[in-house]
């Protein structure tokens, strides 16, 4: 696994050793940064000064530091100012290029090109360079089979994990948020939102986690606003789409969502946690929120209303029905916990069976863990 992260204070000791070792033996280099002197102490001081710039990145393979990347911006182009790697292969290169593409898109560049002036090019990327020594990255550059995956809470029980893997879904675990309330730090629907099969949006703090685990063909945008543990900034991504409608409270939705889904008509609801409150399928919704129920029906979207409450959410009086599960066409509605433990199970099962939707549940409390996202 290739993991890219912002340069942080905790990385400076290890990175100084890395830079010191490679100072005369770079696979890629534009020019050696004059601030990175030969003396290791000077290197550490220089690196610490760069942390606040937020354009210096470290590259790991598993837990081993293998690279260092410095970016710069110039006339709507993203420049690789410096890149130092102690090994190179297609997997590493493409993960770096995928990160660069996300970075450009999240900064709303008109074009996605990267200059490599003075670099030595690996055979892997020579065919992708234009006559100005630039690389334009497109999704079809990433020759990957589109494997099925599910993003689930890192607190999910083994029964669910085995079920998903047994149905050929790769499991991606949620990020452990340090900005959210600890009781919902694992909740998928607070951290990441699916736009379509090839594009997702995630919170700023979770980007490097999801970029490491998501396939390279997925474009991963980042929220414009920073998530907090207070409403409305705790639910920037907690909205949903159905039949070309975006169901949300505009006061709590991140601007990036509105830009990416500008062609969808907005159904305005009072509920800021609209995804938490709703089971969303291709053709209908099941919700415990009366404002969502009434609003979507006005647009001729089929909806079912279920009683609120009686759902476990540690530290809270109750959880939300949408947070208990996720939907995909081949598996139906997949629950984190045991539907038999849900007070209103008969009504919920009635809705699902009326629509010929399969459902699966595991042996756990009927619990809200922040939805499951399938792709």
Residue ranges and their predicted role:
Residues 58, 64-72, 79:
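Conserved beta-strand in the GNAT
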Residues 113-124, 134:
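Conserved beta-strand-loop-alpha-helix junction that forms the acyl-donor binding cleft
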Residues 1-26:
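A short beta-loop-alpha structural element at the N-terminal edge
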């Amino acid at each position: 696994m290739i993991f890219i992260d912002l340069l942080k204070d905790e990385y400076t000791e290890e990175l100084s050793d890395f830079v010191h070792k490679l100072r005369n033996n770079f696979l890629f280099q534009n020019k050696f940064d004059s601030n990175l002197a030969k003396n290791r102490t000077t290197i550490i001081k220089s690196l610490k000064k760069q942390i606040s710039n937020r354009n210096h990145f470290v590259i790991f393979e598993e837990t081993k530091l293998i690279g260092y990347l410095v970016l710069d911006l110039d006339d709507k182009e993203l420049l690789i100012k410096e890149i130092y790697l102690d090994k190179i292969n297609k997997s590493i290169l493409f993960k770096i290029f995928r990160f660069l593409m996300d970075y450009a898109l999240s900064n709303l560049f008109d074009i996605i090109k990267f200059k490599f002036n003075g670099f030595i090019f690996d055979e892997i990327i020579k065919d992708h360079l234009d006559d100005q020594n630039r690389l334009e990255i497109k999704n079809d550059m990433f020759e990957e089979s589109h494997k099925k995956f599910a993003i689930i809470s890192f607190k999910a029980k083994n029964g669910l994990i085995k079920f998903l893997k047994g149905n050929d879904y790769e499991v991606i675990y949620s990020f452990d948020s340090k900005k959210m309330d600890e009781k919902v730090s694992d909740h998928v629907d607070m951290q990441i939102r699916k736009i379509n099969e090839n594009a997702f949006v995630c919170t700023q703090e979770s980007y490097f986690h999801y970029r490491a685990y998501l396939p390279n063909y997925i474009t991963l945008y980042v929220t414009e606003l920073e998530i907090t543990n207070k409403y409305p900034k705790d639910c920037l991504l907690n909205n949903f789409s159905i039949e070309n409608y975006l169901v949300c409270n505009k006061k709590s939705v991140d601007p990036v969502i509105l830009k990416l889904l500008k062609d969808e008509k907005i159904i305005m609801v009072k509920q800021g946690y609209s995804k938490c409150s709703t089971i969303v399928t291709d053709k209908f919704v099941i919700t415990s929120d009366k404002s969502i129920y009434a609003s979507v029906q006005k647009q001729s979207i089929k909806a079912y209303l279920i009683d609120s409450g009686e759902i476990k959410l540690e530290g809270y009086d109750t959880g939300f029905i949408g947070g208990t599960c996720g939907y995909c066409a081949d598996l139906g509605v997949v629950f984190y916990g045991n539907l038999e433990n849900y007070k209103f199970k008969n009504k919920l099962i009635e809705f699902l069976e009326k629509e010929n939707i399969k459902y699966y549940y595991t042996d756990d409390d009927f619990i809200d863990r922040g939805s499951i996202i399938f792709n």
